[in-house]
A protein has these predicted regions:
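A conserved beta-turn-beta hairpin within the catalytic core of GNAT-like acetyltransferases
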Residues: 51-63, 73, 120
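Conserved hydrophobic beta-strand within the GNAT/NAT acetyltransferase core sheet
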Residues: 63, 97-101
Length: 129
């Protein structure tokens, strides 16, 4: 994830990280999507499907941590991931999919080309760093 947030601390593969990864993979609400090119993980994202009591009790999806390794950008891998995440959300009967991005104009246009609409809602964040 260094290509997403270069200031993030390095994660060491240890027992607690392996346990967390195992829990994440077993959680049916979380869908981890990856692109592998010749054994190299070049792009990934996560779709979380949340149960909901509105909209006829239909769930909604949140896409997070969309990242492509800098050496593999502009080759369609990110688009492939986003489209797959949207397809899964539809299969899960989500009434909407949301994502947030604080990146530059190119990134915002990337999401718009994938079908997302800018300016429909306003996002708010509280960080606990």
């Amino acid at each position: 994830y260094k290509d997403l947030n270069e200031d993030d601390p390095e994660l060491k593969m240890d027992e607690s990280l392996e346990k967390l990864w195992d829990e994440l993979l077993k959680d049916p609400s979380q869908h981890y999507l990856v692109v592998d090119v010749g054994g190299v993980l070049v792009a990934s994202c996560v779709l979380v499907v949340l149960k909901n009591l509105t909209r006829g009790a239909r769930p909604y999806g949140i896409i997070e941590n969309v990242v492509t390794h800098k050496d593999y950008r502009r080759k369609g891998y990110g688009t492939m991931l986003i489209k797959k995440a949207i397809d899964i959300a539809k299969e899960e009967n989500c009434y909407k999919v949301m994502l947030m991005s604080g990146r530059g104009e190119d990134t915002l246009r990337f999401y718009e080309k994938a079908g997302f609409e800018r300016g429909k809602k306003t996002g708010f964040i509280i960080r606990f760093d």
